[in-house]
Amino acid sequence: MKDIASDLNLSKMTISRVLRGQTDVSAATKARVLQRMKELNYRPNVAARNLRSGSTFTIGLIVPSLATPFFAEVAKGLVETLRTAGYGLLISSAEENSETEQFEVGFQLSRQVDALLIASVQESAEFFNDLARQKKPLIMIDRKPPLFSAHFVGVRDRDIGYVAAAHLIKKGCRRVAYLRGPRTAAADLRYSGYRAALNDFNVTFRPDLVVESSETSHLEYKRGADAMRRLLREKVRLDGVMCYSDLLAVGVIDAALEKNLNVPGDLAVVGCGNLLPVQHLRVPLSSVDLVGLEVGQRAARLALRLLSSEKVAPYQQLNLPPRIVIRQSSQSGAE
């Protein structure tokens, strides 16, 4: 550290602040220090640093599933931002199971993470109250638990449903089906956004156009295809389909093409996620982008602020707007 300070004509205190991830160092100075560290292959003594500071310089992240592309994007945004501040990321998966999540929370706390970020599968208020008593910075990611106040970073699921349905209606669709996801709060909120868009654009709600889909898994594609085949078999009239996920939407499109329907001429389709290689499909898929990378970046910056001496207003609510990426499956000149 002394050599780096001398080489850059900076004080050892400034170098130390960069290593600790403090925010009162200019971006230019931080970049110079990190570049010189790289050139010298400098590795700080983590154990000594942790003992001095009482910090592990590790942030914990618990997600419902590591198989979900959205959470991979969130983790990427976190890692990129935390790395520049000298922090690492410890990731755990709850596998969409509340008991597994409780185990992972205990594991992360036993590792003395400095802050905990969690996209929780829990519905118990007691669980969240126990978390709050740990006196560690806590940020909820993507999923906002009811009846519990905490910092939150994510996209409003209701907005996701609204944006997708509104796009199809603006394209001219009047009989818009909705393929629901699992019975979760997020799925219910997307459904409420779908209903709100129908109402705002004076489109009649038809219960027969709402199709339940069992829990998300590697079988999502099959569930989407099966649901579409059933709608066609029952001769349900529809001209647009909004899907809870991209995988469901891909299944819908393939089932429609089997019956020689034109997508988007006969049937417009929109998914949610924009994380699969949907632009390379037979019919490139329109999808609502959940901005996972930005969610991760914003959550990391909030965590660092909470860990610094900076004053942060209680229970920050960072609701990021979703955006729709329009491709061939719902191509429209209206947007």
PLM regions with names:
Residues M1-F57, A334-E335:
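N-terminal helix-turn-helix DNA-binding module of bacterial transcription factors
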Residues D7, K12-R17, R52-A67, H167, ...:
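Short beta-strand segments enriched in small/hydrophobic residues
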Residues V46, P64-E73, I91-T100, V153-V163, ...:
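Hinge/beta->alpha junction and helix N-cap segments in small-molecule ligand-binding domains
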Residues G54-A166, K170, R233, R237:
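Alpha-helical recognition/docking segments in bacterial nutrient-uptake
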Residues T84-A85, Q134, L198-F205, R233-V236, ...:
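Short helix-capping segments at alpha-helix termini
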Residues R175, F205-L209, V263-A268:
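Short acidic capping loops at alpha-helix termini that bridge into adjacent secondary structure
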